[in-house]
Design a protein with these regions (language model features):
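Extended, small-residue-rich solenoid/repeat segments and analogous flexible loops
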Residues: 221-253
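Collagen triple-helix signature
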Residues: 1-218, 226, 248-325
Length: 325
């Protein structure tokens, strides 16, 4: 067992598949959060899984769960290899705080690693953590994106992670976005990765029952909810046209394979869109797009897009929103 420092307080950490995983912070730790996590080790056969992010203290006020570790690369120098799975994001404290982001899946020559699931928010306030992106592959399928986490009564559902790209195989499917509860948006469904055949986009989360916009690619809901969504779209249209971001809603995901940046979340609240992954069949320097910024009142920044080419490294992650983000 090793030791990791969390906001000035040391906690024990464990080891999982060669990856360090943070233990839960002290139950009465105030604003302490557990952020200790380590990526999985690389291998010629199968990369190690990333460690899970630590949970915040049970009664911590506004502390976020730790981010999951990135899965290790598999088969970087050989014909075979499976990318390691990304670690799950840690959960927030019991009542307040946002869930941690899931770790990205590792690159695998034959199969990309699965993205980690986003952590859940506190019961009253906080946004769900974003799901990690699936890992890239060359000859086989890209990894599936992780599901977004569950928010509190006030907060946005986490975006689903984008599916991993593949050079000659099928792109990975995107992860599902988390549903809003009362006030807040549903998370965007993760975009499908590019490949010989593109992966499917994940289902978007539904907006909160009182107010909130559905995430991208959300399923059909009740007639009352559909009318609510139509009214919000009318309100959002002039803001989107004049400023490039909605009043209430998430930013759009960047187009997969272009390295385009994700759009910014709403002026009031919303998640930033995920950045699109870089182009495939290109050098490893084909970078992914930056994630969009979160909403002004509350909202999480979008995940950065993974690189194209043959590496599956991670792009820049968007800035989180202020306030409850």
């Amino acid at each position: 067992m090793g030791s990791g420092e969390v906001d000035g307080i040391c906690v024990n950490v464990g080891v999982q598949n060669g990856a360090t995983t943070g233990m839960q912070a002290a139950p009465f730790g105030g604003s302490v959060r557990c952020v200790c996590k380590t990526g999985g080790g690389h291998s010629l056969v199968a990369g190690g899984d990333g460690g899970a992010g630590g949970n915040a203290g049970m009664l911590a006020l506004g502390a976020a769960g730790g981010a999951g570790g990135i899965g290790g690369d598999g088969g970087t120098l050989t014909a075979g290899g499976i990318g390691g799975a990304g670690g799950a994001g840690g959960n927030a404290g019991m009542f307040f705080g946002s869930g941690g982001a899931g770790g990205a899946g590792g690159f695998g020559r034959t199969t990309g690693g699965i993205g980690g699931t986003g952590g859940n928010a506190g019961l009253l306030n906080g946004s769900g953590g974003a799901g990690g992106a699936g890992g890239a592959a060359i000859t086989g399928p890209g990894g599936t994106g992780g599901a977004g986490g569950i928010p509190g009564l006030i907060g946005n559902g986490g975006n689903g992670g984008d599916g991993g790209a593949s050079v000659t195989g099928t792109g990975g499917n995107g992860g599902a976005g988390g549903n809003g509860v009362q006030i807040g948006n549903g998370g965007n469904g993760g975009s499908g990765g590019t490949g010989a055949a593109a992966g499917k986009a994940g289902l978007g989360g539904l907006g909160g029952q009182l107010i909130g916009l559905d995430g991208s690619n959300a399923p059909v809901s009740t007639s009352v909810h559909t009318l609510q969504q139509a009214a919000l779209n009318v309100v959002n249209e002039p803001f989107q046209t004049l400023t490039g971001r909605p009043l209430i809603g998430n930013g759009a995901n960047g187009t997969p394979g272009t390295g385009a940046a994700g759009g910014a979340g709403g002026w009031l609240f919303g998640n930033g869109g995920n950045g699109g992954h870089g182009a495939t069949n290109t050098p490893a320097t084909a970078t992914g797009g930056a994630g969009g910024a979160g909403g002004v009142l509350f909202g999480s920044g979008g995940n950065g897009g993974t690189r194209g080419g043959a590496t599956g490294g991670v792009g820049v992650r968007g800035a989180g929103g202020g306030g409850g983000g």
